[in-house]
C-alpha cells in the first residue's frame, strides 16, 4: 500500500496541481477577507439594531433577528446552493465567484453580528447610565463608551470565527 502511494505521488505533486492549489488558497483567503470585512461592518449595524428599544425600529429589529437566526442555522453549503439558485435567474451569466462572495458575506454577517452583540451586551449598564448622565447621544455612547470596552470581548470569538470561516470558504474556492 505504501509503495503504491510512493508510485502515484508524482502524479499528484506536479506543477499544474500546485498552481491550482495556490489559486484556490488565494481565492479562499480573499473571500474570507471580503466576507469578514463586510460581515463586521454590516454585523455591527445589525447588532446595534438588535439592541435598539425604539418602537420605530421594531420592524427592522424583527427582520434583523429573523435574518441572523436563519443564516446561523443553515449550513454554508446549503446557503451556497440557495444563493446560486436565487441569483442565477435574476442575473443570468453572473460568475460563480460573485455568487460565492455573496454567500460568504451573508453567513459572515449573521455570525459576526452575534459576536458583536455579545460584546456590546457585556458592557455594564452603569457605564451606559453614566454616559447618559453626561448627555452623550446614542452615537457618542456607542463610539466613546460601549465599543472601546467591548473590544476585549469581541476579538477572541471573532478571531476564532475567522479561523473557522477559512475552512468554510474553502468549499467555494474551487
Language-model features and meaning:
Residues 1-174:
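Transmembrane alpha-helices and adjacent helix-loop boundaries
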Amino acid at each position: 500500500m505504501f509503495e503504491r502511494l510512493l508510485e502515484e505521488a508524482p502524479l499528484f505533486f506536479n506543477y499544474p496541481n500546485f498552481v491550482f492549489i495556490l489559486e484556490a488558497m488565494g481565492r479562499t483567503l480573499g473571500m474570507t477577507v471580503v466576507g469578514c470585512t463586510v460581515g463586521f461592518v454590516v454585523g455591527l449595524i445589525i447588532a446595534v439594531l438588535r439592541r435598539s428599544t425604539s418602537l420605530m425600529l421594531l420592524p427592522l429589529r424583527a427582520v434583523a433577528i429573523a435574518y441572523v437566526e436563519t443564516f446561523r442555522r443553515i449550513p454554508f453549503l446549503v446557503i451556497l446552493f440557495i444563493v446560486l439558485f436565487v441569483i442565477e435567474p435574476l442575473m443570468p451569466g453572473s460568475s460563480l465567484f460573485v455568487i460565492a462572495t455573496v454567500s460568504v458575506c451573508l453567513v459572515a454577517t449573521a455570525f459576526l453580528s452575534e459576536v458583536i452583540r455579545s460584546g456590546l451586551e457585556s458592557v455594564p449598564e452603569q457605564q451606559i447610565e453614566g454616559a447618559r448622565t453626561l448627555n452623550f447621544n446614542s452615537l457618542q455612547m456607542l463610539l466613546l463608551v460601549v465599543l472601546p470596552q467591548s473590544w476585549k470581548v469581541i476579538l477572541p470569538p471573532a478571531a476564532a470565527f475567522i479561523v473557522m470561516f477559512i475552512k468554510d470558504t474553502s468549499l467555494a474556492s474551487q
